[in-house]
Amino acid sequence: DKDEKADLGNNPGENGQSDSLNLLVINKVEKTAQILQISRDSMIDIDIYDVTGNKLMTEDGQIALQYAYGDGEERSCQLTAGKVSELLYGVDVDSYLSLTLDGLVAATDAVGGITVTVPEDYTAIDPSFEKGATITLNGDLAEKYVRKRDIEVLDSNNQRMERQSQFMEALIEKMQGIDDKTEYLSLYQNLDEYMTTNLTAEELEELADYKISEDIVKVPGEIISKDGHAQYLVDNKELKKIVLNLFYKLL
């Protein structure tokens, strides 16, 4: 949720938050993949750490907050991945990739812009975001499209998640269209300063071989307001069905 990577050494709880959380579930046998979108406001037990990295306590909070108790880079990603695993009943999260907003701008410009059809009237964010309008987002406009929201509206994050899903599908499609390995590695190198990941360039390139479903699955639940903040209460019964369907196979 920051334009740049956090400065190491910041106080715990001040190293940014996860603005958008998505888990790519891959089937290595069938070479298919499915995106599971997780609301940043999903309530879970957040681990609180001191400046030396010692765990102090656990308290109820939005999953986006867990990132803030790391270092803004690898540690933040590891902590967040752990909470995603916890949310999904212990399913292993093997890899992570975090991209700053500056990186989003760079990625969008690198692929020549992203074309979307605006699903609702978002002219309050930008005059060009009229309902039904088909527009090509450049870097700065792309940031507005996936980041901006009216925090006074309780459901604004869910609305933003819809735009993020739409944008992500279009970006993945563009990146999968890159056939030249040299061009792909060049894109990876250009994004390196904005990105934190434990994946190699070669591993990321391999994802181009997977057919990614256009239907993004969302963690089910309902949004409520409490103490002036949005809270997304996960429907654990329905989530368990999704986890069983995505990660397990009947024998």
Predicted regions and their residues:
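Non-catalytic, solvent-exposed segments at the cell envelope interface
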Residues: 1-251
